[in-house]
């Protein structure tokens, strides 16, 4: 399992980095979750650059998705991977389903 952070940088671009929970104590707040959603999509989706309306944690349960950020980096997420989505401003990220997917969503 890998955890990645997608965020808007001071340069106005979105970036991706692999993170470790021990280095990000703020992720401990995720243990106090009040709401969890399950998203399952019946068709493959492709989305151009977009920011998210809120910070969220997404844990991949099934399928593969490629996320691109405006600095040109891309990352493929597989079952067990998690992403902390913090790109709530700026250009945001792209999204391309490689296979049908299901993921847990924690706002």
Q: What are the residue ranges of the model-derived segments?
A:
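Short, ordered coil/turn segments that flank beta-strands lining enzyme active or ligand-binding pockets
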Residues: 9-10, 61, 70, 99
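Short acidic-glycine-tyrosine-enriched beta hairpin
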Residues: 42, 70-88
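Glycine- and acidic-residue-biased ligand/ion/polar-headgroup-sensing regions
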Residues: 53-71
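Short, Lys/Arg- and Gly-enriched loop/turn segments at beta-strand edges
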Residues: 75, 91-97
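A short hydrophobic beta-strand segment most commonly corresponding to one strand
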Residues: 84-88, 98-107
